[in-house]
Curated annotation (Swiss-Prot):
Residues 245-259 have a biased composition (Basic and acidic residues). It comes from Coccidioides immitis (strain RS). Keywords: Chromosome partition, DNA replication, Nucleus. This is DNA replication complex GINS protein PSF2. It comes from the Eukaryota. Belongs to the GINS2/PSF2 family. Its main location: nucleus. SUPFAM superfamilies: GINS helical bundle-like, PriA/YqbF domain. Transmembrane segments: none annotated. GO terms for cellular component: GINS complex. Pfam families: PSF2_N, Sld5.
Amino acid sequence: MAFPLPRGVTPSEITFLCEMEMVTIVPRQRLEGLELLGGPTEPLIPPRRSSLPLWLALLLKRQRRANILPPPWLNTEWLSEFLKAETDHDVFLPPPPLDCASYTGSVARRDARRSGHSGPRRTLDGQRYIPSAPFLLQNVVDDESTAPRNPWLPYHWLELATMLLETASDDLVEPDQIRRIIRDIREIRMAKMRKFTEYVDATAIGGGEGLPLTGVGAMEIGEARGFMSGAAETLRQIGASKEEALREQAEAGDDLRNDYDEDDEMEL
């Protein structure tokens, strides 16, 4: 017996997409560059930093060939400030803007040299290329970048933090404290997601404006998709049955009034 397909993207598929995020490593030994589908990687020369996809960085870390530098947001100071701001607001904090690079300085110049493009990247029709997750370089380390005024979390924050805490906890500062803050942030944001169920009724019937999901992470959307879509479908069916009952009552009332009119005409 075949089971029905899950609604939306599964957690394992979301984790797979997160593994394409770029992170910064410090190699322990020399390695030649690789020809990947996303483009070639630069040769690894210790102790020079390099940017690699997360899946490759985790593989080298397990083989003890490299150390992974934690992203700029994966530290106790940043996460504590984000936790406080998330607690003080009823809505999700906004993510970093897509048209504003989260890194400036050496990383940007190195990527420009590798790609051969000195100016901003363009699409085939000449428009400015604006990448989206997991192709936003929000998890690379750049010493020359300036910290943003307001804390934010990347789109794949939960998956990336979980994988780094499992595989590269020795490369993080105070990993136990980071794990605790991540758990607190996750609980607060899931509580906010559960509050959104009050909008599902109006959205399912058709009179609502939709669910505001700006700032929600990939794994959070994946976890809530099954419940939200199932609840919306149930409420839609309930609303349809109510409309059908009201329609039948209206039709029955019209028939009853027509019968009364016919009786009056016969008496005359």
